[in-house]
Each structure stands twice: as C-alpha cells, then as structure tokens.
Amino acid sequence: MEQEQDTPWIQSTEHINIQKRESGQQTRKLEHPNSTQLMDHYLRIMNQVDMHKQTVSWKQWLFLKNPTQGSLKTRVLRRWKLFNKQGWTN
C-alpha cells in the first residue's frame, strides 16, 4: 500500500493534536477535522471573542462612570494626538 505524500494543502488542512506521553515527551497526532469539530472550534473561538468584547465594553463603561484624573489626562492626550494626525482634512 502506497503512503500518501504530505502536500502543502494536506499539511495546512491537518489538525495537529499534541498529546503528552507518560515519559513527558510530546507526540503529534495528525487528523483531518470533520465539520462538527470545525463548527465546535469556531463556536468556542467566537464565544471567547464575544466575552472579550463584553469585558472591554464593561471596563470602558466603568471608566466613564468613575474616571480618575490620570485616566482622563491619558484619554484627552490620545484624542489630541489622533486629532493632530487627521489634521484639518475633515
């Protein structure tokens, strides 16, 4: 039986799953992910992104509700630098 050559396409589509042996060495198990695994992975990533967005917006809301003098100064300086970059073109 002839073994399939690893083409760049196959290498890029293979899922690398690293498992640790009892001896502490790492082995790589190559497998083609099925559509269920891909969808599961996609949903997990999107959930993490959504949680990150919620955290960022929550921190921004807290900042606006109770800003410190230093944070206000930083915010004003950032806006000023951004305004200077844009210039009078708007």
Swiss-Prot record:
| Name of the protein | Protein PB1-F2
Q: Where is this region: Mitochondrial targeting sequence?
A: 65-87
- Any one Gene Ontology cellular component term annotated for this protein: membrane
Instruction: Please name the taxonomic classification of the source.
Output: Viruses, Riboviria, Orthornavirae, Negarnaviricota, Polyploviricotina
GO BP annotations, alphabetical order:
symbiont-mediated perturbation of host apoptosis; symbiont-mediated suppression of host cytoplasmic pattern recognition receptor signaling pathway via inhibition of MAVS activity
List locations, semicolon-separated: Host mitochondrion inner membrane; Host nucleus; Host cytoplasm, Host cytosol
Organism of origin: Influenza A virus (strain A/Grey teal/Australia/2/1979 H4N4)
List the residue(s) that the UniProt entry marks as the site Low pathogenicity: N66
Q: Which UniProt keywords apply?
A: Apoptosis, Host cytoplasm, Host membrane, Host mitochondrion, Host mitochondrion inner membrane, Host nucleus, Host-virus interaction, Inhibition of host innate immune response by virus, Inhibition of host MAVS by virus, Inhibition of host RLR pathway by virus, Membrane, Modulation of host cell apoptosis by virus, Viral immunoevasion
Function text: Plays an important role in promoting lung pathology in both primary viral infection and secondary bacterial infection. Promotes alteration of mitochondrial morphology, dissipation of mitochondrial membrane potential, and cell death. Alternatively, inhibits the production of interferon in the infected cell at the level of host mitochondrial antiviral signaling MAVS. Its level of expression differs greatly depending on which cell type is infected, in a manner that is independent of the levels of expression of other viral proteins. Monocytic cells are more affected than epithelial cells.
